Amino acid sequence: DVLLMKAEAQLRSGHDGSIAMNLVRNRAGMASLPATLSNLLDERLLEFMWEGWRRNDLIRFGLFHKAYDLRQPIEGESSAFTTLFPIPTNVLKLNLNLKQNPGYK
């Protein structure tokens, strides 16, 4: 995970993340690829398939609502509201300065 986080940070800051990403790929016996955000997202899917990180990755890459919100949105509803969980009611009651996340009541 640390190597893929490093590769992502390098890519997002305009540097080449190929070395870090390909250390992970080569360890698994896979051929090297150029590091792009798309290839990195695919690599995270392969590496963390059963660890429950896909939703977080898709949210971070701005793709979650495109991949999983396939229903018809209600008029006036933001289809991307599912990227945030609602703030629990008891937390809202404890801190009156907090406002519920968009899309939740």
Each model region followed by its residue ranges:
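Long, intrinsically disordered, low-complexity segments
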Residues: 25, 32-105
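Short, contiguous acidic/charged loop-to-helix segments that flank catalytic cores in large enzymes
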Residues: 9, 30-31
